[in-house]
Amino acid sequence: MSGRGGASGIPDYLQMPLGRFLEALSSGEPAPGGGAAAAVSVAMAAGLAAMAARLSSAGELAERADALREEVAPLARADAEAFGRVLAAYRLPRGSEGRRERIEEALGEAAGVPLEMARIGAEVCRLAGRLALEGNPNLKGDAVAGALLAEAGVRAAAELVEANEPEGERALEARRFVEAARRAREKMAQGGG
């Protein structure tokens, strides 16, 4: 696969060289944006956790971190696609039949993608925090970096959920994931106590 757009016209960010992704992120285009950055942050955090687990002889944790990375990384593109559908819904003529419903549906979908990022990120934060405490001490810095990146990704994703759906269960659930990540980070910082 190349970094070029698929059927949706959105590039496969996972196939882009990092420099090109960063250029795209800083361009004047609406996507990639915060959702893609949050997904990539959580994916990098999971990668660090997997590395720390492997070098700590914690194979099960490494496998779980790999699975989380593979689950969250494609959400970078999914978020951009969902945002594109929001923009398309808002471009429908005002007063047209079904416009309001299409906007609400698109916003709901746009909230669902970062909610999934937040869920995954909270688990990555717990896993990386555990590795910082119990893993190979030579890799504590990598595990801590993973936990902090994961928490940042969770917080960013939760903000996007609330931006798209400020009221309702999804916003509350996103806040719970932020709280879970915060607790995991604090537990790690306190040495597990």
What is each of the regions a protein language model found here?
Residues 2-193:
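Conserved, well-structured ligand/cofactor-binding cores
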